[in-house]
Amino acid sequence: MKKSLAIGMIGLAASAAAQACPDYLNTEMRKLSSKETINFCDSYAGKPMLIVNTASNCGYTPQFTGLEQLHQNYKDQGLVVVGFSSDDFFQEENDEADAATVCFEKYDVSFPVMATSSVRGRNANPVFKGLGEAQGYPKWNFNKYVVSAEGEVVAHFGSRVGPSSPELLTLIDEVTGGE
């Protein structure tokens, strides 16, 4: 009896974990200039996220510095910052290795950045399809989406809202349980 109860509890816990991760995050994508992939549900279920569409040759590209600072400041509170390289606005390097150089060497980014993909419209990758349907597709590079630990898309900020903007920081504090 105890064994079947324990098995039932494990099954219930697995079912609850699966329900906690929404379909749009239940996808596996390749990291920038790498063969390594990330399944967002497996890696980040139950964690708040800041998801950003990025480009290497944009006037907003220096926001990588602030995004890295957010990553460093909030990672211990569970926040996951993820960049999505995209050429939808024609400002990403054609070669992924060059895009990776900008991210990881020039801006010293340590948070995950995904391989170049589309982030808007019918060609959007599954993550941005979900974000776009919930809060609108990005109209330019460096749009920021705040996602709760339950996978709810809480807010969408345009490019002009920088990583240190009070309105963004307030929401990040809310989803991480900070001040």
Tell me the role of every PLM-derived stretch.
Residues 19-26:
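Cleaved targeting-peptide boundary
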Residues 60-124:
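Structural microenvironment flanking redox-active thiols in thiol-disulfide oxidoreductases
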Residues 45-49, 76-80, 107-112, 141-142, ...:
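Loop/turn elements at helix/coil->beta-strand transitions in domains of secreted/extracellular proteins
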Residues 1-4:
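Positively charged n-region of N-terminal signal peptides that target proteins for export
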Residues 53-57:
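Amphipathic alpha-helical repeat scaffolds
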Residues 27-48, 69-74:
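A short beta-strand-turn-helix
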Residues 13-17:
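N-terminal signal peptide c-region/cleavage motif recognized by signal peptidases
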